[in-house]
């Protein structure tokens, strides 16, 4: 993390296209680190950071699903838009925290 960056929320979750990993919300960005785990000894290793989106680049945040609930966001890049869907435990809380972090980041 960069200087002045604070971790607001972090959770082990699954992204629809990328797979399992850890979703992290800071006061500046959303990041998703891929993980690898082994069942034999219950170990888990961090892999590469595959999603690293500044909060200024997040154009839309929403939640979806009835049985399998997901928190989703769309990232604007110069070329296109990318949508990510994360299966987290408490989608309502994640949605509120992401929206608040985006608002606070814009007000700085």
Positions of predicted regions on the chain:
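Short acidic, Gly/Pro-enriched loop/turn segments at secondary-structure junctions
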Residues: 37-42, 57-74
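Anionic N-terminal interaction surfaces
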Residues: 1-28, 33-35, 45-50, 65, ...
């Amino acid at each position: 993390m960069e200087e002045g960056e604070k971790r607001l929320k972090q959770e082990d979750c699954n992204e629809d296209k990328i797979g399992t990993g850890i979703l992290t919300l800071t006061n500046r960005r959303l990041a998703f680190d891929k993980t690898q785990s082994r069942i034999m000894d219950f170990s888990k290793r961090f892999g590469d950071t595959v999603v690293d989106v500044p909060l200024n680049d997040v154009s839309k945040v929403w939640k979806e699903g009835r049985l399998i609930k997901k928190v989703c966001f769309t990232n604007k890049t110069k070329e296109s838009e990318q949508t990510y869907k994360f299966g987290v435990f408490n989608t309502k809380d994640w949605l509120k925290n992401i929206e608040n972090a985006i608002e606070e980041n814009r007000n700085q």
